[in-house]
């Protein structure tokens, strides 16, 4: 699950692994409200404005890796823990989260092998549709929305997302799967996304809200991400983000995962 929406690859999968460990509790969510119809800007124009607002295409393409450090909390359960994420081009990532009562959860993709390890499940080798989704989500330059990765990208409507005017965009991937993204009308920045990702429990629909954009180096990134799924909420906050400092060895597949590869 990554929500695939930021360069440090904090996705739905990591949140799902933690949230499924707790009993569900109601989380109020603010559903998008449809506004009156009007002439809509092309989706490509909306996406390109976001790219410009966070630093520009050239600045994004100049990066080779990111290392993010932050905190993660689950308000309904009263839990707060640590978060760390590594991401490198073209499509490698490692995410690590530690929470009281749940322990450490790791997810990774080395460009070929997808895996997860937690104290709850032990080592798991990701395959099938989950692996396909992880490969897609791991794209280091996902923010650019390269046309060749999609069947179509279109503006659906102007609506309200988290209390603010937003453009709703539908992204249809090769193969037919769809993601929805929301872009703030006033700031041009990506405000959130709605996506479905496969899990051991089946397909899970999740909503991610991006906020508190801050500049790290030459690029702006959202420092707060609220993930809502399965009637639970997880809040991830980034306090430090570095570019170009990741050792490639960090993406090495762990021994306990290698033991599962046939």
Residue ranges of predicted features:
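N-terminal mature ectodomain segment of secretory-pathway/periplasmic proteins
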Residues: 44-122, 148-160, 173
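Short, conserved active-site entrance elements at the starts or edges of catalytic domains
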Residues: 133-168, 189-192
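Acidic/charged, solvent-exposed loop-and-adjacent secondary-structure segments enriched in E/D, K/R, S/T
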Residues: 115-142
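N-terminal low-complexity, Pro/Thr/Ser-rich intrinsically disordered segments
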Residues: 32-49
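Signal peptide processing junction and immediate N-terminal pro/mature segment
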Residues: 21-32
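Gly/Pro-enriched, hydrophobic low-complexity segments
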Residues: 29, 98-100, 162-257
């Amino acid at each position: 699950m990554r929500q695939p929406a930021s360069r440090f690859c904090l996705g739905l999968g990591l949140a799902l692994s933690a949230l499924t460990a707790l009993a569900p509790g109601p989380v109020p969510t603010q559903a998008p409200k449809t506004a009156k119809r009007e002439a809509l800007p092309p989706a490509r124009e909306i996406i390109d404005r976001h790219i410009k607002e966070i630093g520009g295409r050239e600045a994004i393409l100049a990066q080779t890796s990111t290392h993010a450090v932050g905190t993660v909390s689950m308000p309904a359960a009263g839990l707060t823990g640590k978060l760390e994420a590594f991401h490198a081009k073209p499509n490698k990532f490692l995410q690590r989260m530690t929470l009281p009562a749940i322990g450490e959860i790791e997810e990774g993709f080395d460009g070929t092998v997808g895996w997860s390890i937690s104290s709850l499940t032990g080592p798991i080798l990701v395959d099938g549709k989950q692996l396909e989704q992880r490969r897609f989500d791991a794209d280091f330059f996902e923010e650019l929305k390269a046309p060749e990765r999609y069947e179509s990208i279109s503006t659906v409507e102007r609506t309200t997302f988290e209390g603010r005017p937003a453009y709703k965009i539908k992204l249809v991937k090769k193969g037919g799967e769809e993601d929805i993204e929301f872009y703030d009308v006033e700031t041009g920045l990506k405000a959130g996304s709605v996506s479905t990702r496969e899990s051991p429990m089946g397909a899970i629909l999740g909503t991610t809200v991006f906020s508190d954009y801050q500049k790290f180096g030459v690029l702006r990134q959202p420092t707060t991400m609220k993930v809502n799924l399965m009637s639970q909420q997880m809040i991830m906050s980034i306090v430090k983000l570095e570019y170009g400092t990741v050792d490639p060895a960090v993406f090495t597949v762990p021994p306990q995962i290698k033991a599962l590869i046939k």
